[in-house]
Swiss-Prot record:
This is GTP-binding protein ypt3. NCBIfam families: small_GTP. GO terms for molecular function: GTP binding; GTPase activity. CDD domains: Rab11_like. A lipid is attached at C213, C214 (S-geranylgeranyl cysteine). It is a lipid-anchor. Has a role in retrograde traffricking of proteins from the endosome to the Golgi. Involved in the secretory pathway where it has a role in acid phosphatase secretion.
Length: 214
């Protein structure tokens, strides 16, 4: 096996939200440090990967991006299967994209594992002069629904690294706690397998009390 294909954990993380909110550019910025101002709407599903190291463990982050249009909803179940993290993205300049966050969250919780780590992401902060959704409104929604929250710009890279790292670190923390409680040295899934996490409610309560993003 090639060295770049070796890893201790594979974390599947999904990007969801309305079409045009910048999901594909967030994916490109995090995995390749690129931005395409003429990016077109995703057709179907695509994903990219990036390897990171947390606590001396090699993590392969597999980030999935899907079309936000209704006609692609048939792929929903397969898209969410095995996901341990999710970023719900809206456009801070487009109120309707934020208004639809509740629907995306409902769909996520219907199809994904109940213990998935979720972050609400307000994208396009490079367009602050066009802001339609206040930070306070989004923070309130996130707090009410037990989500972490951050605002980003895929164009100038603001907070993109922090957003993904926060989600991946929280997944890793939960996995590490599960391993410690089981009394073993850590879980090492075979390459190519997605690791499912199942934190207790105590884990989730600790998360809310100990971490607030932005």
């Amino acid at each position: 096996m090639c060295q770049e294909d070796e890893y201790d954990y594979l974390f599947k993380t999904v990007l969801i939200g309305d079409s045009g909110v910048g999901k594909s550019n967030l994916l490109m910025r995090f995995t390749r440090n690129e931005f395409n101002i003429e990016s077109k709407s995703t057709i179907g599903v695509e994903f990219a990967t990036r390897n990171i190291v947390l606590d001396n463990k090699k993590i392969k982050a597999q980030i999935w991006d899907t079309a936000g249009q209704e006609r692609y909803r048939a792929i929903t179940s397969a898209y969410y299967r095995g996901a341990v993290g999710a970023l719900i993205v809206y456009d801070i300049t487009k109120q309707s994209s934020f208004d639809n966050v509740g629907r995306w969250l409902k769909e996520l919780r219907e199809h994904a594992d109940s213990n998935i780590v979720i972050m609400l992401v307000g994208n396009k902060t490079d367009l602050l002069h066009l802001r339609a959704v206040s930070t306070e409104e989004a923070q309130a929604f996130a707090a009410e629904n037990n989500l972490s929250f951050i605002e980003t710009s895929a164009m100038d890279a603001s907070n993109v690294e922090e957003a993904f790292q926060t989600v991946l670190t929280e997944i890793f923390r939960i996995v590490s706690n599960r391993s410690l409680e089981a009394g073993d040295d850590g879980v090492h899934p075979t390459a190519g397998q997605t690791l499912n996490i199942a934190p207790t409610m105590n884990d989730l309560n600790k998360k809310k009390s100990s971490s607030q993003c932005c």
